[in-house]
């Protein structure tokens, strides 16, 4: 192994020292957070590439959308603190903010809401697509496939270099993805599809299409509507995570917005990304059923590595402090469960949190509750099936995906993403004839 190091200079440059020479790199300055070293022609001039599995220290892009300070527990969309937005804005306002860069004026918000409201209907032929999927298909697979298929119905909105087409595709996706999710749910239940009602707002419409029936009026619960809106805001963007990076990767090939978003949905379906709230709920149910509801006993097992017990919903790849979304979700969980009826699993969750926040084992490992710890309890109380939780995550993350897709297309010097690798396979060898192997 050879020695190398990178040092900063006084002229806003960084210098890489490696066997055979030095390589000078520009430093790009962030408005907040970590500055970046621009590798530029490093490969051609040094013969070296960077090696960073999982992109732990690699910035793939410049972005103006979301800022995270994991050490301080800060999350901001376009400069606005997440707590401020969750308390004082609607999901559609936040969606507009992420996609357009500024909060909408009253007229702009009215137009945005109106466009979404009047594009919720699906082509009647589209409904037959849901009959193709098995009743036990995971709704994330159905949703991703449906968004892919949606692109075939809007072939005049597929050019990623046409701003007018991008605007139309943005509205179609914002309007129709929740409808696709609701239809996927109805199809696997064998329940009749519900047409959207333009007299309702987007969240009211979604809940009605999920749980209503055409034979009777659906009673809107404003507390449930507000809670769902708030949860979607909390999930609307989270910088360069796996699914967002997937959307940007696909979009870098100038694939259309529909198929790029479908790729993000597929990435989100992975249990390490979007399935954590389901895992938390399953953990709580396991503690109740198999550990007598004893939170202390369970947490002791977590600390004993030989027991192999995992604590779900604690810790985060980015946050080394309390996830700023978690406190908002916890408060929302209290509100919704108090309204809909108590849940002994909430009491159990609170007990687990209290133990973790007072125990040096968890504190030293920075294992604080994350956004997923309480969301599953809320979704279950609302009546959503457990395997539908990630679909709700996707609906919330949709405006963030759209914002990143569009930002990347408009970036100066945008190129198709093409990571490098360090090859560790066989060196050149001759093919051995089949009969001699």
From Swiss-Prot:
The active site is at residues 316, 372. Keywords: Allosteric enzyme, Transferase, Tricarboxylic acid cycle. The keyword Translocase does not apply. GO terms for biological process: tricarboxylic acid cycle. Gene3D superfamilies: 2.20.28.60, Citrate Synthase, domain 1, Cytochrome P450-Terp, domain 2. It catalyses: oxaloacetate + acetyl-CoA + H2O = citrate + CoA + H(+). One of its GO terms (molecular function) is citrate (Si)-synthase activity. It is an enzyme of class 2 (transferase). One of its GO terms (cellular component) is cytoplasm. Its EC number is 2.3.3.16. It comes from the Bacteria. Pathway: Carbohydrate metabolism; tricarboxylic acid cycle; isocitrate from oxaloacetate: step 1/2. Weakly inhibited by ATP (apparent Ki = 10 mm). Belongs to the citrate synthase family. Citrate synthase is found in nearly all cells capable of oxidative metabolism. Homohexamer. This is Citrate synthase. The lineage of its organism: Bacteria, Bacillati, Actinomycetota, Actinomycetes, Mycobacteriales.
């Amino acid at each position: 192994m050879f020695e190398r190091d990178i040092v900063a200079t006084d002229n806003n440059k960084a210098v890489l020292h490696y066997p055979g020479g030095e390589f000078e790199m520009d430093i790009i300055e962030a408005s907040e957070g970590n500055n970046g070293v621009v590798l530029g022609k490093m490969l051609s001039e040094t013969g070296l590439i960077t090696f960073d599995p999982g992109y732990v220290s690699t910035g793939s892009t410049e972005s103006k959308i979301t800022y995270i300070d994991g050490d301080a527990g800060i999350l901001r969309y376009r400069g606005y603190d997440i707590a401020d937005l969750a308390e004082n804005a609607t999901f559609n306002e936040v969606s507009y903010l992420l996609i357009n860069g500024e909060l909408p004026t009253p007229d702009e918000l009215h137009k945005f809401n109106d466009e979404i409201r009047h594009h919720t209907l699906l082509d009647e032929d589209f409904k037959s697509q849901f009959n193709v999927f098995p009743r036990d298909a995971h709704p994330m697979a159905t949703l991703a496939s449906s968004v892919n298929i949606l692109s075939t119905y809007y072939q005049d909105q597929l050019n990623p270099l046409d701003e007018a087409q991008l605007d139309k595709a943005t509205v179609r996706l914002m309007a129709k993805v929740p409808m696709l999710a609701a239809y996927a749910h109805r199809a696997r239940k064998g329940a009749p599809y519900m047409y959207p009602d333009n007299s309702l707002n987007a969240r009211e419409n979604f809940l009605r299409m999920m749980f209503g029936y055409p034979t009777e009026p659906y009673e809107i619960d404003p507390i449930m509507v507000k809670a769902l809106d708030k949860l979607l805001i909390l999930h609307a963007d989270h910088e360069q995570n796996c699914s967002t990076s997937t959307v940007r990767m696909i979009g870098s090939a100038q694939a259309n917005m529909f198929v790029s978003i479908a790729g993000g949905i597929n990435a989100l379906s992975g249990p390490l990304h979007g399935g954590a709230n389901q895992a938390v709920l399953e953990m709580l149910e396991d503690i109740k059923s198999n550990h007598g509801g004893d939170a202390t006993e369970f947490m002791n097992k977590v600390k004993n590595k030989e027991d192999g017990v995992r604590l779900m919903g604690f810790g985060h790849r980015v946050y080394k402090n309390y996830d700023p979304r978690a406190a908002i979700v916890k408060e929302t969980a209290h509100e919704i469960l108090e309204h809909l009826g108590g849940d002994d699993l909430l009491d159990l969750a609170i007990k687990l949190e209290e133990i973790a926040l007072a125990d040096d084992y968890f504190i030293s490992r920075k294992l604080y509750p994350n956004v997923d710890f309480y969301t599953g309890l809320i979704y279950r109380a609302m009546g959503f099936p457990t395997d539908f939780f990630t679909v709700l995550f996707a609906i919330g993350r949709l405006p963030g995906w759209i914002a990143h897709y569009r930002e990347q297309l408009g970036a100066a010097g945008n190129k198709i993403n093409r990571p490098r690798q360090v090859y560790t396979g066989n060196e050149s060898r001759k093919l051995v004839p089949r009969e001699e192997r």
